[in-house]
Structure formats: structure tokens, C-alpha cells
From Swiss-Prot:
PANTHER family: FIBRINOGEN/TENASCIN/ANGIOPOEITIN, FICOLIN-1-B. Keywords: Calcium, Collagen, Disulfide bond, Glycoprotein, Immunity, Innate immunity, Lectin, Metal-binding, Secreted, Signal. Expressed in peripheral blood leukocytes. Also detected at lower levels in spleen and lung. GO terms for biological process: complement activation, lectin pathway. It comes from Xenopus laevis (African clawed frog). Transmembrane segments: none annotated. This is Ficolin-1-B. Glycans are attached at N205, N222, N254, N287. NCBIfam families: GGGWT_bact (NF040941). Its main location: secreted. One of its GO terms (molecular function) is signaling receptor binding. CDD domains: FReD. It holds the Pfam family Collagen. The keyword Nucleus does not apply.
Length: 318
């Protein structure tokens, strides 16, 4: 065997032993009957060093606008800014048109009576400007139809009140109350009204006094009392001398006396200097030793007797 053949066989054996793990590839190419050419291809070499970056290509066309992203969470509330400077005061507006009077609704207890109501109690009435009021209607006394605006009966309510309280009204529907001077003005500002005072002493003796042309002025005139004449009643007249006087309270002195009559006689009334009646005075339960500071009616039981029940009421004048 020639040396060339031996070399060839050795190469074949080596190739078989590393066929699965090595990369060389051996090819035998026949040239002639007696000559063979062997080609051995080796493994790939180590990668070379990367070449330099080529020049940038031209900019691509602008893409379409994407969809809006999900809104983020609201941030924390910022600090409150300082109050700005007040602007100039605007001009006073024009006076509005008068409201439409309420049609078909009772404006006093007499109208309720005319519509068939016959039981004394609390009813809703309307002033000429449409204000609704709940009032006590006396449907029995002297033909009925009276609005009761003052009642004393048990001493459960303090009547030594200030101006604002008498303006707005106070008390309880089931016992003692004052309807309110502002309401009295609104209810008597139009028309003519009769006034009636009903008194009951602790012996259950009942007396009364009546007057014509009752009216109460506005607050700007201190709720001045207007009266016509004394028209009768067995209690006698202890109010006519108070006509044309403003209303006085412990904190608003409109009387003719150097001192406050309201403070001195513990009440609130159309005092002169000072009074012949004091039906908003202290509830002293009959005879009392103090002078003129009870629920007094001079022409009735005098200055030292405080009545058990007092009711002051009015209705349209026939």
C-alpha cells in the first residue's frame, strides 16, 4: 500500500470520529484512474471588527396621529387664592310692578265666615300683597269674623319683649300670643275696621269695649295707633286716649314721658305718659299691690287688678 493511500485512510477515520462535533468538511474529487485530489474545508474564522456606520438615510414620511392616551388622575387641589377687591356698588334697580292680588282667597276672618266657616280656630288668610298668615278667628263673639291679635289667659308667655319681638309676633297658638305689629299694619292698611277688647276677670265676669276705624301705621311711623270713636261696651273706654301714639317697648321709647313707660310698667303699648290700659303688662292674677304694671284696664277693674283673660280683635267695619 502506498503512502498516499495510508494518508487518505487516516483522514477518513479522523473525519468519522469528529463528524458530529467538528466542522471541517472533506471532499475527495477524482482526477484520473490513479490520481485523487483531496479538499479539506476548515471552520469559520472569528468575526471581524464591525465596519463604520453608514450615512443616515433620508427622513421617512410623518406617520398618522395616534389615538389619545388614557387621561391621568386629577392632581391635588391647589391653595385657595386671596379674595379679590370688591367692585363698585351697582345702581339701584327700578321699582318692580305691584304683585297680582290673590283672587278667591280669604283676606280676613269675616270672609271665611261669609264662605261658611263657623268654628273658631286657626285659619290662613292673605294680605293684599299676597302674604299668607295663619290667624285665630273668633267666629262666635257678636256675630263672629274677628281676627284675634292678642290673647292673655294663663301667664305662660312672657310679654315683656323687645321691639323686634313685637314687630314679628310671638307666643303659642294654644295659649298666649301677639300676632305682630308688622302683620297688623299689613292687615289694616286698607279698609276700615272695628276693634273689640274682651276681658274676663278671675270671677269669670266678662266685659268688653269697642271702637271704630282701627288701623296700625307702618314701622316707619312706629306702628302708630289710629282709632275713630268709642262705640260702647261695659268695660268702659281705656284706649281712646292712646290714639295717635307710637308703640313703645323696653328697648324703643316712643311715649311722651321723660322716663320709659314700658320699663316702668313692665309692658309694651301705645303709651302716652303713661297709660289708662296696659294689656301687655305682667300677668299678676287678680288683685296686686303694685301700681299699674299688670294686665290693667283702668275703666274696668282699675290699676291694681290684673285680668285673667284678655283678647284684642278686629274685623271689617260694616
Amino acid at each position: 500500500m502506498t503512502r498516499w493511500v495510508q494518508t487518505f485512510l487516516l483522514l477518513v477515520a479522523v473525519i468519522r470520529s469528529y463528524a458530529e462535533d467538528s466542522c471541517p468538511d472533506v471532499k475527495v474529487i477524482g482526477v484520473g484512474a490513479s490520481d485523487k485530489l483531496t479538499i479539506l474545508r476548515g471552520c469559520p474564522g472569528i468575526p471581524g471588527v464591525p465596519g463604520p456606520q453608514g450615512p443616515s438615510g433620508p427622513a421617512g414620511a410623518k406617520g398618522e396621529k395616534g389615538f389619545p392616551g388614557i387621561p391621568g388622575k386629577m392632581g391635588p387641589t391647589g391653595l385657595k387664592g386671596e379674595r379679590g377687591i370688591s367692585g363698585p356698588k351697582g345702581q339701584k334697580g327700578d321699582k318692580g310692578d305691584p304683585g297680582i292680588p290673590v283672587v278667591g282667597m280669604a283676606q280676613n276672618c269675616k270672609e271665611w265666615l261669609d264662605q261658611g266657616a263657623s268654628i273658631s280656630g286657626w285659619y290662613t288668610i292673605y294680605t293684599t300683597n299676597g302674604l299668607s298668615l295663619t290667624v285665630l278667628c273668633d267666629m262666635e263673639t257678636d256675630g263672629g269674623g274677628w281676627i284675634v291679635f292678642q290673647r292673655r289667659m294663663d301667664g305662660s308667655v312672657d310679654f315683656f319683649q323687645d321691639w323686634i319681638s313685637y314687630k314679628r309676633g310671638f307666643g303659642r297658638q294654644d295659649s298666649e300670643f301677639w300676632l305682630g305689629n308688622n302683620n297688623l299694619h299689613l292687615l289694616t292698611v286698607t279698609g276700615s275696621f272695628q276693634l273689640r277688647v274682651d276681658l274676663t276677670d278671675f270671677g269669670n265676669n266678662r266685659t268688653s269695649a269697642s271702637y271704630s276705624d282701627f288701623r296700625i301705621a307702618a314701622e316707619a311711623q312706629n306702628y302708630t295707633l289710629s282709632l275713630g270713636t268709642f262705640t260702647g261696651g261695659d268695660a268702659g273706654d281705656s284706649l281712646y286716649g292712646h290714639k295717635n301714639k307710637g308703640f313703645s317697648t323696653k328697648d324703643r321709647d316712643n311715649d311722651s314721658s321723660p322716663a320709659s313707660c314700658a320699663e316702668r310698667y313692665r309692658g309694651a303699648w301705645w303709651y302716652t305718659s303713661c297709660h289708662s290700659s296696659n294689656l301687655n303688662g305682667l300677668y299678676l292674677r287678680g288683685n296686686h299691690s303694685s301700681f299699674a304694671n299688670g294686665v290693667n284696664w283702668k275703666s274696668g277693674r282699675g290699676y291694681k287688678y290684673s285680668y285673667e283673660v284678655s283678647e284684642i280683635k278686629f274685623r271689617p267695619q260694616p
